[in-house]
């Protein structure tokens, strides 16, 4: 979730049974990215600010980078977020099917969270997939 953690992961290798092991990829979570900024994990950190963290990581690592995008934002903003991340060289994104006010699953205190409808969530995934195909990924 930072250049430092990415550098540690990039350099970490262990030998086990005569075989060298290392991490296959990096994951940047919205939780850690928010907490590093002293903010709650409620989608308050905007993509433009998260890009700063992504650039630090990309600078020191050649490993594939997977980005947790929470809900992915509004359907209208979704393709623009994907385009920006594609241009940065992000390998994959993960989005949640939650709607309404963001509540981190780790800290939900028993509160129920609303899920998007299957049709809405499928539409978001299909739009994202279609847009990525247009970018020739």
Feature roles, as predicted:
Residues 5-6, 13-49, 69-75, 94-119:
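Glycine-rich, proline-tolerant flexible connector loops at the mouths of alpha/beta enzymes
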Residues 5-13, 125-130:
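Short, well-ordered amphipathic alpha-helices
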Residues 40-67, 88, 109-137:
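Alpha-helix-loop-beta-strand connector modules within alpha/beta enzyme cores
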Residues 78-92:
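Short, electropositive alpha-helical surface patch
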């Amino acid at each position: 979730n930072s250049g430092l953690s990415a550098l540690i992961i990039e350099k970490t290798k262990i030998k086990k049974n005569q075989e060298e092991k290392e991490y296959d990829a990096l994951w940047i979570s919205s939780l850690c990215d928010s907490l590093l900024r002293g903010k709650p994990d409620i989608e308050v950190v905007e993509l433009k600010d998260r890009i700063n963290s992504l650039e630090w990581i990309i600078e020191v690592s050649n490993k594939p980078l997977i980005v947790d995008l929470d809900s992915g934002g509004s359907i209208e903003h979704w393709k623009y977020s994907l385009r920006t991340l594609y241009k940065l060289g992000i390998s994959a994104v993960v989005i949640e099917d939650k709607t309404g006010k963001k509540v981190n699953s780790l800290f939900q205190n028993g509160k129920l969270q609303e899920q998007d409808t299957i049709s809405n969530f499928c539409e978001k995934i299909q739009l994202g997939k279609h847009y990525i195909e247009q970018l020739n990924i």
